[in-house]
Amino acid sequence: ALHYIASTAQPSAGKDGKYRLRMPAQQIDTILNWAGQINALVFVDIQVGHSTVKDEVHSLEKYLQLPNVHLGIDPEFSMKNGEVPGSKIGTFTSDDINDAINFLAALVRKNNLPPKVLVVHRFTQGMVTGYEKIKKVPEVQVVMDMDGFGDKILKRSTYQRYIYKEPVQFTG
């Protein structure tokens, strides 16, 4: 699988004040061409900054309509209280995650696609709130992914506390 951060959190507001930069379509197209050459899955990832999951996912609709393209969302850079991305660890609520699930499920139904994979990157408990309210639908397979930093002991204990005990559907 190829992983591409299609919307990248930024330390400055940018013209739209959203503290994120959407990558040019030609770059995403290049990744899709590479994937086509090796029959690979593609994960487009979003870091919302001051934007929303809903807005960023909608901007990727033409890619997410493809059967081999899936979605990753990164709460680390979701700044709900106006902070600069990277100044602290951000958070997604179950509503944010459900926005992605609803969008992907509708695409799957509308385009008769195989289920989409939604990867939620998480390495602290506060990065996801209300995990028990995250929807489980047949069109979307939700993976809570522990992608933290630090030594092996820290990573293992973090996985046990926040991913294993709050799995939603699948863990990674």
Region spans (language model):
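Surface-exposed substrate-engagement region within the catalytic domains
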Residues: 87-172
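Chitinase-like catalytic core of GlcNAc-active glycosidases
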Residues: 1-41, 50-66, 70-72, 79, ...
